């Protein structure tokens, strides 16, 4: 089966008065003109993008943008001297080339893509190598990598401070630290390791003291890799630890709140984790001070969203069958909104009883869509809230009223599972990236062909007899959907690549605890 990479991330931004689109397709970032959809640049350059069914020279791996690490000790190999072994030598060379192919492809996904407020920098995280990369964007759309920093623990959320000078990075193990967007002086800190004790590592727990199957598996893992439990690595670049969770961190946003006593807004760091917690901490200079918590979820929290028109409201969602709207400064639940009941959007004013046989919900995105540029829409609502569920081919739509309450609207039906949403303007126009590889509503079954289906769909909010969403069209979406040759994955590698695509697109449901009834 031949297929195109789906667009897993898409961003709309303005760079020096020019509107651009940044899209992630597989292992690459592509910059498009937001008006025409023409491709302006791509990273990595085409010369470094290895075709999956072709061979490359082994000396290109270091120039493909992978993070520099201390070289391993090399073993000297003596070439064969027997002239009759030319065929064997040629076969050996091909084997080395195949190994170099595997070594070069240090990542296959780009899970995080953030645009600076000025639009001239992009921060991205490449998947398998856990490398945080900063790019410069020119008005002509040219993308140039400026820095790369390998993170010891996998980054799961990135945010930029309002001055666009500092990156806040949250990692898989719950730590949040700050690092400069563009370090002035290259400071390389040695990787620090915890001192090894004279006694061999021995977990404090035993098979007689653990009480759950989950803890037993964790103990067995520690016993299998005792040295890994002793070793703790820290970033080898300039950074400052701000705060930490005792659970896996899932999302992070930086929330500025207008202050009555000063001209500059007060900053807060809002973080969520796998253990149903939402923490509100003070800004980077006082991040050790916890302002409060927003407690009310009963499953993991995967996504946070603050509408730009109401900075004191927070909308959160994850593994529960509802989203929650908070007065986050007070830590108070303002509204609980059911998401799905028997496959239909539930009314926002009624609580639906949970059903044991209902499919598990995993919120993959919460998006705030502004209406400020469309007076006809602002008569009905301050903006729109769209919720994407993992493996669901529709967007759940809500209106955000002037009273701060959400009201459910008819869902937006898509041609494939929703992957990402971006607002194109402040008049209620959006682009939705959809999964062109899997069948709608499934994360396992594949389409017969992934070349024909759309990569992007465009929708606009209408106020005819009430607020609703209708499909529309843009030149950019039409042009991008018609692109084929540059995106096609080779037939010989499609099976392996489809599995990688599935893993990269649908991983939020894995945050759910292993089984109901087990402790956290």
Swiss-Prot record:
Pathway: tRNA modification; N(7)-methylguanine-tRNA biosynthesis. Disulfide bonds: none annotated. WD repeats lie at residues 105-145, 244-291, 296-338. Its main location: nucleus. GO terms for biological process: tRNA (guanine-N7)-methylation. Residues 51-102 are annotated as: Disordered. Keywords: Nucleus, Repeat, tRNA processing, WD repeat. Required for the formation of N(7)-methylguanine at position 46 (m7G46) in tRNA. In the complex, it is required to stabilize and induce conformational changes of the catalytic subunit. This is tRNA (guanine-N(7)-)-methyltransferase non-catalytic subunit TRM82.
């Amino acid at each position: 089966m031949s297929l195109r990479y789906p667009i897993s991330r898409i961003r709309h931004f303005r760079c020096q008065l020019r509107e651009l689109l940044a899209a992630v397709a597989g292992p690459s970032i592509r910059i498009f003109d937001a008006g025409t959809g023409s491709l302006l640049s791509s990273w990595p350059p085409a010369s470094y993008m290895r075709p999956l069914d072709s061979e490359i020279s082994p000396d290109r791996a270091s120039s493909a943008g992978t993070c520099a690490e201390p070289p391993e000790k090399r073993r000297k190999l003596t070439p064969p001297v027997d002239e009759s072994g030319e065929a064997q030598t040629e076969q050996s060379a091909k084997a080395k080339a195949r190994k170099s192919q595997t070594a070069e492809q240090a990542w296959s996904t780009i899970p995080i893509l953030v645009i600076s407020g000025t639009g001239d920098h992009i921060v991205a995280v490449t998947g398998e190598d856990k490398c945080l990369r900063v790019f410069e964007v020119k008005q002509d759309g040219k993308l140039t990598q400026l820095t790369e920093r390998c993170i010891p623990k996998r980054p799961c959320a990135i945010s930029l401070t309002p001055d666009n000078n500092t990156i806040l990075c949250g990692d898989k193990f719950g730590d949040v630290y700050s690092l400069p967007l563009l370090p002035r002086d290259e400071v390389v800190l040695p990787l620090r390791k915890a001192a090894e004790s004279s006694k061999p590592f021995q977990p404090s727990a035993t098979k007689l003291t653990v009480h759950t199957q989950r803890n037993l598996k964790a103990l067995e893992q520690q016993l299998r890799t005792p040295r890994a439990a002793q070793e703790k690595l820290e970033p080898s670049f300039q950074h400052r630890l701000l705060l930490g969770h005792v659970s896996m961190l899932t999302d992070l946003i930086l929330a500025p709140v207008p202050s009555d006593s000063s001209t500059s807004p007060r900053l807060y760091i809002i973080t969520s984790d796998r253990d149903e917690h939402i923490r509100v901490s003070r800004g980077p200079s006082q991040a050790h001070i916890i302002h409060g918590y927003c407690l009310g979820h009963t499953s993991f929290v995967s996504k946070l969203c603050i509408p730009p028109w109401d900075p004191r409201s927070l909308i959160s969602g994850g593994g529960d069958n509802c989203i929650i709207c908070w007065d986050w400064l007070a830590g108070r639940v303002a509204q609980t909104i059911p998401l799905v009941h028997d496959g239909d959007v539930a009314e926002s004013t009624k609580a639906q009883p949970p059903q044991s046989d209902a499919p598990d919900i995993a919120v993959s995105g919460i998006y705030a869509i502004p209406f400020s540029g469309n007076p006809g829409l602002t008569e009905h609502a301050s903006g729109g809230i769209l919720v994407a569920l993992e493996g669901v081919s529709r967007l759940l739509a809500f209106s955000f009223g002037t009273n701060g309450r959400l009201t459910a609207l008819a869902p937006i039906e898509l041609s494939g599972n929703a992957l990402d949403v971006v607002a194109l303007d402040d008049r209620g126009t959006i682009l939705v990236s959809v999964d062109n590889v899997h069948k709608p509503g499934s994360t396992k079954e594949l389409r017969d062909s992934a070349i024909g289906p759309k990569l992007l769909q465009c929708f606009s909010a209408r106020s005819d007899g009430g607020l609703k969403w209708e499909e529309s069209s843009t030149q950019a979406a039409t042009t991008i959907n018609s692109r084929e040759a540059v995106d096609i994955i080779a037939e010989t590698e499609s099976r392996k690549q489809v599995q990688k695509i599935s893993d990269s697109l649908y991983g939020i449901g894995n945050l759910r605890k292993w089984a109901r009834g087990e402790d956290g």
